Amino acid sequence: MLIGTFTPKLDDKGRLILPAKFRERFATGLVLTRGQENCVFVFPRDEFLQVHENLRRAPLTSKQSRDFNRVLLAGAHDELPDKQGRVTIPPILREWARLDRDLTVIGTGSKLEVWDTGTWQGYFADAAASFDDAVPEVVPGLG
């Protein structure tokens, strides 16, 4: 399971060093793509294949489905971490998420999200403010 919060730096070549505890999970490859709220999603390759299979089931007659697929898949990039656990975040995704040097990487269970640290801090403050109110509706049985 991919969980936790980490604060790596983006190097001058646009590379992210994956947190050591996740490197084995990504050893066979990963897919980086546009994430919602302007972050970068990082899926283990096998997990992304499942996501893609679910997307294929969406009705082609739905404009919302077509739009979502286009935005997600047009920004997708296959990567294989190097021996030091580094992956290059392509310029199009760095621009999408407004990534600079300071990053926040969060585990969300089945994927990682890469955020600009300032953007993450603002997002988290807003999300945390409504956390107590949202739990029963968002995650049945947790409240």
Swiss-Prot record:
It is found in: Cytoplasm, Nucleoid. Keywords: Cytoplasm, DNA-binding, Repeat, Transcription, Transcription regulation. One of its GO terms (molecular function) is DNA-binding transcription factor activity. The keyword DNA-binding applies. Residues 5-47, 76-119 form the SpoVT-AbrB domain. InterPro entries: MraZ (IPR003444), MraZ_C (IPR035644), MraZ_dom (IPR020603), MraZ_N (IPR035642), MraZ_sf (IPR038619), SpoVT-AbrB_dom (IPR007159), SpoVT-AbrB_sf (IPR037914). The keyword Transcription regulation applies. One of its GO terms (biological process) is negative regulation of DNA-templated transcription initiation. GO terms for cellular component: cytoplasm; nucleoid. Belongs to the MraZ family. HAMAP family: MraZ (MF_01008). Forms oligomers. This is Transcriptional regulator MraZ. It comes from Beutenbergia cavernae (strain ATCC BAA-8 / DSM 12333 / CCUG 43141 / JCM 11478 / NBRC 16432 / NCIMB 13614 / HKI 0122).
